[in-house]
Amino acid sequence: MRKILVTNALPYANGDLHLGHMLGYIQSDIWVRFQKLQGNQCIFVCGSDTHGTPIMLKAKSLGITPEELVTKYSNRHLQDFTDFEINFDNYHSTHNSLNKEIVEDIYNKLNNKNLISKKAIAQAYDPEAKMFLPDRFVKGTCPKCKAEDQYGDSCEVCGATYDPTELINPRSVISGQSPIQKNSEHFFFDLPALEKNIKDWIESNTLLQPEVANKLAEWFEQGLQSWDISRDAPYFGFAIPGTNEQKFFYVWLDAPMGYIASFKDYCNKNNINFGDFWGDSSSESELYHFIGKDIIYFHTLFWPAILSSTGYKTPTSVFANGFLTVNGKKMSKSRGTFIQARTYLDNLEPSYLRYYFASRLTSRIDDIDLNLEEFVTKSNSDIVGKVVNIASRCAGFIYKKFDATLSGEIFDPELESEFSKNHDAITQAFEKREFAHAVRLIMALADKANQFIDYHKPWQLAKEEGQEQKVHQVCSQGINMFKVLIVYLKPIIPSIVAEAERFLNIQFISWADAPKFLINHKIDKFKPLATRIEKEKVDKILEDTKKMLENEQSPQSKKEEPKLDIAAECTFDDFMKVDLRIAKITEASHVEGADKLLKLILDLGGVTKQVFAGIKSAYKPEDLIGKHTIMVANLAPRKMKFGMSEGMVLAAGDGKGIYILEPHEGAQPGMRVK
């Protein structure tokens, strides 16, 4: 029995999953199910990737905390996976104490080996947003191939990697402004020092895809560079120890460690020895990472380097899949082809898409096209017309005429032998992730089964006197061929196969026993296992996707010229009654039991006031201490549930964010604002 640990790329918890995501998860799930059917101990883990600037900014725009945002999308992702029959043994998150402990431990080990250094670098800084910009928040023209609208770290056209400062005509994704260059001290991982480790891993990896090997050779030729593993505050993630929460681990450092955390969490729950699967290099277990082709760089350079230098087993291999196109073109919201997983599930069963993807997937990193017309035809022809049809043509005769019991003899041993002889070829195809080849072999057998039934015509034999035994044997062989096919298809369409197993009255058949026919075996009454896809269902998926786009755009498309909702006019004397003062925030803290409030202690130049301000969604207490702001100093004190509020801090807001007012330098606590 093999010990196999499989991980899948962690989905980023700031949006819903689409069918392009599902391609990779379905691929790995099929392979894992196949391994388990063979009797191997195969553990499948995943989790949510939850850190980074995109999550921080989206949460802020929604007026919620990053934790609330990632919880929302993690739950939605897991439900989509469950409904698509992606059967993870454990689903975790990168935002928890276990992952933090692992990240800091690995960082300390790297640091102790002098593989971490610090140096000041020029970074893109958005003066309007007042923050350093992550690589993906800078866009511009690729410095290598001159493709426009490329991210600040890599080009999606030519695959080049570079520094954001190298972009031509860069702009901030946040404000649209041209970023300025500003120095900041960052932490770097010495990747070049571990080049030999990486090359040794590549040489020992007999399963590495040729496309990956070629890309690695290209990167080595360009020369490895030290890797910036830090990001400046503000940032949602784990602070680097000893930086007073001013520097944070780059999301791509802590995200892969989420694999370790998810598996360790599984081990803790199930009393499994972590080292048996993910110990050091001497471990005989197998470790596989399934990923999309856009993240090969991180998983085949940085990840093996980090693992090999910190005492962890390196991957047995990394398997990458291509992107998904729909009807021959890039997924598009305007065409209704940017289909979310949930939109598909609201209209169709997952088995059809799982089967279609399997029929197109190979071990190569090829893009897969979801041709919707072919999708309907193939699902109806193969699943319904070929496989399920075998059982529906034979089951009634067995159930009604022969006490639901299969024959004790095999009618056509030669045909049975042909089904048996294909077992090894189908097994090898699944093992090598050549699912398209496996499907072709399985469907070729389904064709032979249907030809056998067509030739003997049990529906006609049943009308002829003295042909009862032949009807029994022909239909029994048909049911047995169906049984072989559904075992082979179990990794691909598990829910349909589960229904078929109930009909066949079998609880579990191992992969090795798949070709064996059932003799004198009692079956149950046949019920339809799958129905044909109507074209209208697919059309509705496209319509629902377009409507989703319209709903997203409607607030913008109907946007009128901004109108200021000016309050009722007041006199100068009325205004002068309001005493506005410069105040320094000397203390700031959370208010227990309050969702929106922070407690502020304000210094007005010798006079101290306590204020409860509804700014919790926008600011951390520690970020406010020492700031100057403006307050209404003569507002009548107001007794609140949490204490006395002795004024009001001024802030601006548009429903998307809250921004406290800060005076220019030189303004001192106690000065009056006029």
Curated annotation (Swiss-Prot):
Zn(2+) binds at C142, C145, C155, C158. It comes from the Bacteria. It catalyses: tRNA(Met) + L-methionine + ATP = L-methionyl-tRNA(Met) + AMP + diphosphate. Pfam families: Anticodon_3, tRNA-synt_1g, tRNA_bind. InterPro entries: aa-tRNA-synth_I_CS (IPR001412), Anticodon_Met (IPR041872), Met-tRNA-synth_bsu_C (IPR004495), Met-tRNA_ligase_1 (IPR023458), Met-tRNA_synth (IPR014758), Methionyl/Leucyl_tRNA_Synth (IPR015413), MetRS_core (IPR033911), MetRS_Zn (IPR029038). One of its GO terms (cellular component) is cytosol. Is required not only for elongation of protein synthesis but also for the initiation of all mRNA translation through initiator tRNA(fMet) aminoacylation. Belongs to the class-I aminoacyl-tRNA synthetase family. MetG type 1 subfamily. This is Methionine--tRNA ligase. It comes from Francisella tularensis subsp. tularensis (strain SCHU S4 / Schu 4). The lineage of its organism: Bacteria, Pseudomonadati, Pseudomonadota, Gammaproteobacteria, Thiotrichales.
